[in-house]
Design a protein with these regions (language model features):
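Active-site mouth loops of central-metabolism enzymes
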Residues: 3-17, 47, 65-74, 118-128
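Alpha-helix N-cap and loop-to-helix initiation/capping positions
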Residues: 13, 17, 45-53, 153-165
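Conserved, mostly hydrophobic/aromatic
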Residues: 18, 25, 36, 83
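A short, Lys/Arg-enriched amphipathic alpha-helix followed by its capping loop at the start of a domain
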Residues: 24-30
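Generic enzyme active-site microenvironment
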Residues: 34, 183
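Conserved anion-binding
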Residues: 41, 61, 78, 86-181
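A short alpha/beta connector and helix-capping loop motif
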Residues: 41-76
Length: 183
């Protein structure tokens, strides 16, 4: 039977009790801890959150892997060095913001600091955005929801293209990088 990985996400926690919550999630059996970092452009409702200070603060409370999913338009060597030194095990980037040479440098920096690297295909980001990078990443995350216009509001519903996207991404991973995890 396939083991389903479970993460404890920290985006909406009480930061005054974050250490206790991480320890509780660890004891409950999560597979890894999911931290976030955001800037002033993406995720406007969670501006300037996360980063190496959070990872450094929670590292003593878990031996599980900690991943940092960034919602930014920039990621430099210093940021990667800081989160790695704080105890981060994987950096996850939005594929639509990091392409070409900048992504190649980021992948190399992650490897230099002993971290894994993942890419997220956000809402309506085409699979072709990771066509070259798939060879060098450890995880591909797919966001399979999109705007649902059934009631005229911006609700997040299941995208009609989701099943096809999942199938095509699985085929890409199987053909190009079978060690890459898909979520």
């Amino acid at each position: 039977m396939k083991h389903i990985k479970m993460a404890a996400g920290l985006a909406h926690v009480d930061y005054g009790h974050i250490a206790d919550l991480v320890a509780e999630a660890d004891a409950a059996g999560v597979d890894y801890i999911h931290s976030d970092a955001a800037d002033m452009h993406d995720l406007k409702n969670m501006q300037l959150m996360g980063g190496h200070q959070i990872i450094e603060g929670i590292r003593p409370y878990t031996k599980k892997d900690i991943e940092c999913h960034i919602y930014t338009r920039d990621c430099d060597r210093l940021f990667i060095e800081k989160i790695a030194a704080a105890g981060c095990n994987m950096l996850i980037l939005p594929a639509e913001h990091f392409l070409g040479a900048p992504l190649a440098y980021i992948i190399n920096y992650c490897r230099e600091f002993g971290m894994k690297i993942g890419l997220t295909l956000g809402c309506y980001t085409p699979l072709c955005f990771v066509d070259e990078a798939i060879y060098d990443i450890d995880r591909l995350q797919l966001v399979v929801h999109g705007v649902d216009d059934t009631d005229g509001k911006d609700n997040w519903g299941w995208r009609r293209s989701a099943v096809d996207l999942i199938r095509r991404s699985r085929e890409m991973i199987d053909a190009k990088n079978p060690k890459c995890r898909s979520e």
